[in-house]
A protein has these predicted regions:
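Glycine-rich, positively charged N-terminal anion/phosphate-binding segment
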Residues: 4-14, 29-105
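Short, structurally constrained coil/turn elements
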Residues: 20, 75, 146-148
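Short, solvent-exposed beta-strand edge segments and adjacent coil->beta transition regions
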Residues: 21-23, 76-80, 153
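Alpha/beta enzyme core
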Residues: 43, 92-123, 127-176
Length: 176
């Protein structure tokens, strides 16, 4: 194998005002992407590391475990937090807290969690099926994040299952 074939050159990833030089994003994983794991991944040169999923309501209530989850090391160049919520009010309040306290440079919303304990409550991958609620959450999140020009992304799946495909409609809503 020649040296050109062993090194793939990809353009940086642009997220609003942010530039991720190495366009590799570590997906948020509950119980995995804690500070220590993100630090280990940074040492090996990835680009963007998102915290474990934290619920909007727990942030609003300032639950100690949730506040710990959104802590970042001083050398994390892009502080990225993933928020999960099932109502626009708490998602908005959680993002406002993150913005006002300067706790993140990037926010990701979780509409992709397939865990039954999440989807049976109408959250995660099940939420985009409820287009009015999905729209309200996304619009509220964008409004709050834009108060400090913080880029917002959405993690989602193709749908709840093969009979409930939501990604196209959800992507259009998020884009608009």
């Amino acid at each position: 194998m020649n040296s050109e074939a062993s090194h793939l050159k990809l353009p940086p990833l642009k997220l609003g005002k942010l530039t991720v030089e190495t366009p590799v994003v570590l997906a948020p994983m509950a119980g995995v992407t804690n500070k220590a794991f993100r630090r280990l991944c940074r040492e090996y040169g990835g680009g963007l590391y998102v915290t474990e999923m934290v619920t909007a309501r727990a942030l609003v209530e300032r639950k100690p475990e949730s506040m710990r989850i959104i802590e970042h090391d001083a050398d994390e160049q892009i502080r990225s937090i993933q928020i999960y919520g099932v109502d626009a009010v708490n998602v908005g309040k959680a993002i406002r807290l993150v913005v006002e306290e300067d706790r993140a440079d990037h926010i990701d919303l979780n509409f992709g969690c397939p865990a039954p304990k999440v989807t049976k409550r109408g959250g995660g991958a099940a939420l985009p099926w409820k287009t009015d609620l999905f729209t309200a959450i996304v619009h509220t999140a964008v409004k709050e994040a834009s108060r400090n020009d913080i880029p917002l992304t959405i993690k989602m799946r193709k749908g709840i299952d093969d009979d409930h495909i939501t990604f196209l409609e959800s992507a259009k809503i998020a884009r608009d």
